[in-house]
Structures are given as structure tokens and as C-alpha cells.
């Protein structure tokens, strides 16, 4: 086998980051997401995004090529997050409907439109189509935060722990004084 790993494969073999995710510089949300599993942003504007999700073999849930609906949901959720396009935002709820199954090799185009731009809680309507046939529709609730959700969560846990500790100390003091 004569395989030269240093041989120049040519530019047609090279996938540049801007080809994989042309909006990577404008997109504030989900910088480390695997676009091969969640789709790529095709259009990005104020309170709206369009993404393309390609259903691959690794997403199949059976031998017939049915894509597990969790992958489709994840791709729709990513489209919603892209429409909001805030660094510290997280999906807190969704109401969704699947209208048709997705199979290996299909492309689902998601169109996401966000409302309530001035609010911390945004509502995003997402429609997914395959060959102009609606296969998905959902409304996502996205909350925009001041900091990363884990930092806020940690601060809240620490605050609750301090309150419990003060309550225990107060109860012990009252017990000793009785």
C-alpha cells in the first residue's frame, strides 16, 4: 500500500472552517457545538437564523435508516439558539411536533425566528422542512443570562449552602440558650 500521508491532497479535499461554518465569527452562541450533529448556519440576521441539518448514518436508530428524533430536536434547538444569538443563553422549554420521519441522507432546513428581543426570555418559532415538506415545527423558550449558566448555578448553590449553615447555627444557638 503506497499511501503517502504527506502528499498534498489538493484543495478539493480540504474543508476550511469558513466552509463548515461560514458564520462562525458572527455567531455568539454554542461555539463548540459539533455542526456535523446539529447542523450549520446558512443565514444569520437579527432575531432569525436558517440552518441546514444533514442526517448521517451515525444518527440512525434502526436498519431502515430512521434518524432518531433527538438529533432533529437538537438541530432545531440549535437553530433557535442561533436566532437569539446571545453568548449566555439557554433553552428552558419547548413545545414541538414532528410531522414526518427523517432518514439517512436527508437534509432538513430549519427557519428560526425569535420574538421579544428586549426581554430576557425569548420565544423562538422553528420550522423544519425537507424538500419543501414541513417535517418539524416547534416553539422554544430561550432565556438570556448575564453569565454562563453553570456560574449562576454554582453561585446559587453556594448561597443556599450559606443560608442553610446560618440556619443551623441559629438553631444550635437557640437550643443552647433554651
Kindly give the residue locations of the regions a language model identified.
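HotDog/MaoC-like acyl-thioester-processing domains
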Residues: 1-20, 88, 103-104, 115-178
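Short Pro/Gly-enriched beta-strand edge/turn motifs at strand-loop
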Residues: 19-27, 31-34, 107-109
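Catalytic strand-loop segment that frames the active site of acyl-thioester-processing enzymes
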Residues: 29-67
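A generic structural signal for short beta-strands and their flanking turns/coil linkers
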Residues: 35-37, 47-49, 90-94, 106-108, ...
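Short beta-strand micro-motifs enriched in acidic
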Residues: 42-44, 113-117
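A structural signal for short, well-ordered beta-strand segments
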Residues: 51, 94-98, 112, 126, ...
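Compact, glycine-rich, soluble single-domain proteins
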Residues: 63-73, 77, 81, 93
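Hydrophobic beta-strand-centered segment that forms part of the acyl-chain substrate-binding groove
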Residues: 78-109, 114
